[in-house]
Amino acid sequence: MSEPLPPPMPHARIAIIDLGIGNINSVEKALKSLGAEVFVQQDYALLNDATHYILPGVGSFAAASQAMVARGGAAALNNLVGDKPLLGICVGMQLFARSGAEHGVNPGLGWVGGEVGLLPVPLPLPHVGWNDITPVNDCPLFFNMPAQPCFYFTHSFAFTQVPVQQAAAYCTYGHSFVAAVQAGRRYAVQFHPEKSQQLGLLLLRNFLQFG
């Protein structure tokens, strides 16, 4: 894809949904570096006027799930986001699943078919560092990127199964796993774009184009 990179979406107002489970400063800083208006809030009632949503997560699926349930679960988040674009990052991606098996089985949002489990690999865990991914299904997050862009990962758990049509990228660490998903206007990545230098910023900038 060689088209000129579009400018950031005008008047984008980005809400970072704070589940209280990890440091989100790097996500906020990366978005602000792109010229976006960014605010962070735990109370869904104060997030209604956003144009885009970010669901970050650092830590365990169990803690993220419990924090989400305490805020009304999938129904409350569906009501908040509606048809606006949303990007899940790391554990935020894992929450798209039906359930996760970290520290017991806990419910996810059910936006993507499949569950989250420990990576079944003969390699050290967590999977930490830079790795190439292979985008599929023409996911617009990867507009204007190389065929196999490289991003920064740090995780031990991942989707164990994803319907082919909802997969947006794959990565290999001992074996192939889903590194990004798409469900309508809701997107998610297992890696950390905010820590992935220029390609990470490009991914976030692409997300800001979704009006």
Task: Give, region by region, the residue ranges found by the protein language model.
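Short acidic low-complexity segments
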Residues: 38-49
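Cysteine-nucleophile active-site neighborhood
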Residues: 59-130
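Extreme N-terminal starter segment of soluble prokaryotic enzymes
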Residues: 9-15
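Amide-donor transfer/coupling interface in amidating biosynthetic enzymes
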Residues: 3-7, 115-211
